[in-house]
Every structure is written in C-alpha cells, then in structure tokens.
Amino acid sequence: MGLSEGEWQLVLNVWGKVEADLAGHGQDVLIRLFKGHPETLEKFDKFKHLKTEAEMKASEDLKKHGNTVLTALGGILKKKGHHDAELKPLAQSHATKHKIPIKYLEFISEAIIHVLHSRHPAEFGADAQGAMNKALELFRKDIATKYKELGFHG
C-alpha cells in the first residue's frame, strides 16, 4: 500500500503547482465535490445556501475553506505516509464534530484527482494520477483507523 520514493516525488511535483494557488484549487475541488455529490453540501452549514456554481464561485468563504482543506492535505502529503501527528486532530474534528463519513473523503479524493488533471494535464499524467490515488487512499485508510479509535464508524 505504501508509495515508492518515485511515486511520492510525482505527488509532490504536482502539489507544487497546487501550492501556487491553493485557494483557487481548493475552491475548484469543493465546487466539483458539491456538484458531483450534493449530499456533501449538507455537512457545511456555511455553504448550504449555495445552490449554483456561480454562487459557489462568488463565495469568499468557500474559497477560504478550499484553501484550508488543501493546506492541511499538503501538510499530510509532504510527510510521505508518516502523517500520524497531522491526522490525529483532523480525524478528531471530522469524526466527532463534523461527522464526515469516510465515503465523503472518497468523493473529495475523486474531486482532487479531477481538478488536478484538468488544471495540470502535462504534470498529471497516468503515473502521477496513480501515485496521487495511492497517496489519497493511504490517507483515507489511516484516517479510517483513527475514526474507529474514536468510536466513529462513518
């Protein structure tokens, strides 16, 4: 399940592109998530009222949250699988406060892959997509373990 050093390098190379515009990428990821899986919007009191893509694009709060999400994910990815310290508080808040099911993390992973491919087709070919999929799967597996430790089976 672990990634090779070469796979981590592919992940981090494309992540460098993401970091040039975290808020924009994050906004695109959340819009893709909410459009593809409208049920996920119900978990966000701040965004529930946003019904159209235009409303979502105009929301500074959505852009800020997208930045927060991708900043946290970037910190996790840079740990190359040694992310226990970063996952603990994230699992705690997502399991006990926000009650975000693992399935929703799969949905946002799909949105991330889609956005990276559409924004960076040259840097995000099949090998990089495969590596990112593995990295996101590792993240989900490890956060699911933390969820269970917290008694959340979402």
From Swiss-Prot:
This protein's record includes keyword Oxidoreductase:
yes
* One cellular component (GO) term of this entry: extracellular exosome
What catalytic activity does the UniProt entry give for this protein? Answer: Fe(III)-heme b-[protein] + nitric oxide + H2O = Fe(II)-heme b-[protein] + nitrite + 2 H(+); H2O2 + AH2 = A + 2 H2O
List of residues that carry Phosphoserine: S4
Which residues are noted in the entry as heme b-binding?
Answer: H94
The processes (GO biological process) annotated in the record are:
removal of superoxide radicals
What keywords appear on the UniProt entry?
Cytoplasm, Heme, Iron, Metal-binding, Muscle protein, Oxidoreductase, Oxygen transport, Phosphoprotein, Transport
GO terms assigned for molecular function:
heme binding; metal ion binding; nitrite reductase activity; oxygen binding; oxygen carrier activity; peroxidase activity
Query: Cross-referenced SUPFAM superfamilies, in alphabetical order?
Result: Globin-like (SSF46458)
Q: Which Enzyme Commission number(s) are on file for it?
A: 1.7.-.-, 1.11.1.-
* Superkingdom of origin: Eukaryota
- Residues the entry annotates as binding nitrite: H65
Root EC class: oxidoreductase
PTM-bearing positions, type Phosphothreonine: T68
Q: Binding positions for O2?
A: H65
Tell me where in this chain the Globin domain is found: 2-148
- PROSITE patterns annotated for this entry? GLOBIN
Q: Where does this polypeptide localize?
A: Cytoplasm, Sarcoplasm
Question: Subunit notes for this chain?
Answer: Monomeric.
Q: Which family does it belong to?
A: Belongs to the globin family.
Per its database record, what is this protein's job? Monomeric heme protein which primary function is to store oxygen and facilitate its diffusion within muscle tissues. Reversibly binds oxygen through a pentacoordinated heme iron and enables its timely and efficient release as needed during periods of heightened demand. Depending on the oxidative conditions of tissues and cells, and in addition to its ability to bind oxygen, it also has a nitrite reductase activity whereby it regulates the production of bioactive nitric oxide.
Name-wise, this protein is Myoglobin
Species name: Phocoenoides dalli dalli (Dall's porpoise)
Q: Which gene encodes it?
A: MB
